Amino acid sequence: MDLRRITWIVRPWFVAAIAVVCGIALFAPRVALAHAVLVESQPGVNSTVSGPDVAVLLKYSSRIDPKHSTLTLLNPDGKVEKVTIDSQPSPEVLSAKLTGLVKGAYALQWQVLAADGHITRGRVPFQVK
């Protein structure tokens, strides 16, 4: 093996360049990689709550755009109702108020646009007693 060919690898400028690239990869903000995943909800998944009015709070793993996000409620009759999103308490949270709910099984369906530009969706089934 010719040592003259590989000695350029250990030169200080090359080591510094590798360190900079590794530093950028390790410490760069992760916002661009983070889809909005639901991390907490009120009502909770498969929970039982008292009606007729229910406060909704959905917390996600990253910032979301409320203007391009939707909430709908599937009621016990199988009908889908649009839910109005209230002002955001924080960039990762959606809130709303559900009123006039009767006893039965419901599913809160959500679709959010995350800061990374990806749309994620899901549902939170719950019961009203």
Predicted regions and their residues:
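Cleavable N-terminal signal peptides
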Residues: V20-V21, A32
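Short, surface-exposed alpha-helix to beta-strand junction/turn motifs within ectodomains of secreted
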Residues: V56-E81
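Extended, polar beta-sheet/loop recognition surfaces of beta-rich domains
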Residues: A55-K59, G117-K129
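A glycine-anchored, Pro-Gly-centered beta-turn/N-cap motif
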Residues: K97, V102-L108
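Bacterial N-terminal signal peptides that target proteins for export
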Residues: D2-I18
